[in-house]
Structures are given as C-alpha cells and as structure tokens.
Amino acid sequence: MYDLIFNDQNLGDTGSPKYFDLSEHLVPISAMDKREVKPSGMFTIKLELGEFMQEYPDRNVYDASQGDGGFSLGGIPPEELTEALLRYLPQSRSTQYGNPIGREDVREAVFHNYYGFDTLTGLTPDNVIFGDGGRDLLQKWYQLIVSNANRCGDIVLVSAAPWGSYAQGTYINGINTLMAPGTPENGFKFTTEAIDVSLEFALADNRRISGIVFTSPDNPTGNYSSYDELINLIEYSVEKGITHIFVDLIYQVVTDPEVGCYDVNKLYNALSKEAKQSVVFMDGLTKSAGGSNLRNAHMVVGNDHWVHLLKGLATHTVFPNALGEAAALEIYGQENPIDHPWVKRVTGPTAKSRAFVRERFQKLGYKFICDQGYYAFINIWPYLRKVIPKGITIADSQGSQKNRIDTAEDLKTYLTTKCGVAIIHGTVFNQPHFIRFSYANDPVYTAGAIKRLHDSVTALE
C-alpha cells in the first residue's frame, strides 16, 4: 500500500467505474451485422507464382500484379537510404519522438520545392501534414469525416472501378462506400452526372454523401484527369453539398514527360473559397520513388480547423516514421524533387514501358486503358467461358479442380500458377471483366510479360 493521500484531500468516488467522456458525448449502442474486412489479395497473388516456378524452375516468371516499384524496379539502395538517414537524424537524442504531423524542415521542403506554393494560396508549411503512408492518411481523413459528421453510416463516394482499399478503410471507420456509375466507354471516370445520380441514390436511402475521392492518375484504370476536369469535379462536389473532398495524387509524378505533375499551386488558387475549405490533396513516395516500405505520404489541407483536428488524430494514433521522413527530406529538399535520381529510376523505365504497352496491346487488338501512372486496365471478356488447354486444370475458390475459365479470378489463377505471369483480377475493383496489368518495370521485362500474357490467353479454347 502507498501513503499518497493527504488528510484533507477528497478524490471523490474512486470505487466506481467512470466513463472518460460526458454522457452526451458517449458513442451510442448501435447493432449492426458488420462484414469481415479481409486481407488484400494484392499482397499475396504474386506468391502464387511459386507454383509455376516449382514446376518450371528454368522458365522466367513475370509479376505484373502489385504496383510495387520498390520491388519491380529495384528500390532505393540501402547505402543511399543510410546516408539520407544519417543526414536527417540529429547528432544527439536521435530516437526521440518526432512531430506528429512531420518535422518542420520536411514540411517546408515539400511546401516550397515540390509545390512552390505562393502567398496567394494563404497556405503555410503548417498546412502540410505527413503520415505513415497513404493508407494512414486515408484513415485519418475517414476519422475526420466521422468526427465532423458526428454520426456513422454516411457515404464516401468513389469511382465505378475503385482501388480495393478505399472500400475497406471507410468501412473500418463506420462509413459506407458507394461506387458512382461509370462505363468502359468513359473509362469508368467520374462525371457530374454520376455525382447527381449518386446523391439521389443516397437521399432515397436516407443517407448523405459526406466525402468523395478523386484519383489521378487512377488506380486501377490508369485514367488521367485533366486540370480542368479536376477543378470542375471539385467545385461541382462542393456545390452539391459534399463537404469532404480527397484528391489522391500518389501517382502524379509517374507520368509521361510531356504530362508531368499537376501545378497544385495553380489548381488551389483557381478554387473557390468553399472548395479550398473542403479539399485535401495527397501525394507521397510510395509510387514516385518506389518507396513502398518507407511509408511516407503527406496531405495538403487548406482548412485550418481540419489541420487542428488532424493534429489531434495524429498525436493519438500514428506518427511519421524517421526513415520515411529522411527519404522525403532527401527528395523534397532539392530544388526540383522530380529530378532526384531515386525518382528518375522509377519514372524513366515506367514511361518507356507505358509507351510499349500502348503500342503492343493496340497491335494485338486488346481493348484497354493506359493513360498514366503504373497500370493498364484490360478487358478480358473474350477469354472468359474458355477451356484451358488439355491436361491443365486450376483450383477454383472452393479448392476443386476445373478446366474452364469462367471468371476473371479463374483467369488470374490460370495465368499465375500455370503460365507464370501474375496480374490482378478486376473483381477486386468491382469490374469482373477486366484485369489490372502493372508496367512499373524495365521495358524488356514488360515486353516479356505481355508476350507471356498474350500467348497464355490465346492458348485458351
């Protein structure tokens, strides 16, 4: 026992449990039949190549599945990362807590060198918030929506072919994901008409659309939205009462040289006052530098109250990591970050691969999208309902053997385990007649992957 209490001291009722929050702020009981959030198959599909490698140890395999430049393009050499980390860390107390939203010099570097924000924006480096990768920042954005809405069950609107994790991160935070209508003819792109239809749908279900996500270049389709398209979509969303707008630019550096990055300074200055208070831009090192495991991304947040709230979320959840910040300072600390060697090692070969993908798939007669970024989105309808070559069977989702391709997932299994080329089946993106093909590779490797893919699907009967 401790002798800690003074004779005249009254600590109140210490023998009863007590809620941390006042009764009016307690989370209400709300029963729901919540589905399971399953692990992403994008991290495991490439492992299925092992079956092919075991049977054909002397043949090349091709991984065109996950967009992981840190793997497919070799990544950043460890000795270069070590040097960057040594430059970043202070000489003493090098493992102390960092700033929950990113160290000041890193935020200043991205503010001035990467975006070149001018005084007209009204922004400062305090409006730049770093996190532990894109997923971390998305989680904080979802939490911000719930905090601002003071209720669960509302909607975040995504495209007709969304990145798989958009629909999981929302759900984890008590938000529903609604996919806007979209067709192959418009590349599954967002339109103002699609926003209108989605708002009507939500209203009929007694819900509201609290957030919307625009991604350019897009994952999985590779679609690229022009400057004017982005401005129009952002402003239209605000006009229609959507209060949280997330613009995911994580692939914007990985474009053709003549396309380049968006001028976010110009884009931000062109927005209305209301739009500036509603929009968040995200970018990072995962794709531009192949820094997949560095887990470094940042948001530009014009709403100062949101900055305050996001700081609060960061202090109680996840801080930026030191190695990721060191890499960010190495890149953003130079005058023109997109000319950094780490970036060029990704953008150079990927641009060459992209040009080859367009030329080759067109020559072979495929229907596909291949604008910018890492991916081509390919219509594989002609290869469904086909029979696998004699003597070859694949396992279906129940583990039974079959000799027919009925679904895009069957095609993925056939290509990966029997042909040695890994892709992502479009079911992951709510488009079961498509596959995603990553060309973030050396052009020679990409050429081999296309040949293996084409030879394999044309062998189906």
Regions found by a protein language model. Name each.
Residues D248-L249:
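Walker B catalytic acidic pair
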Residues K344-F361, K367-Y383, P389-G399, H433:
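Conserved glycine-rich beta-strand-loop-beta hairpin in the small C-terminal domain of fold type I
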Residues V61-D63, M282, Y366-Q372, G426-V428:
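Short beta-strand
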Residues S92-G241, Q252-E274, T446:
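Conserved core of the PLP fold type I
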Residues I45, A64, V110, V128, ...:
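Generic structural signal for small/hydrophobic residues in well-ordered secondary structure
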Residues E104, H112, D118, G122-L123, ...:
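PLP-dependent enzyme catalytic core of the Aspartate aminotransferase-like
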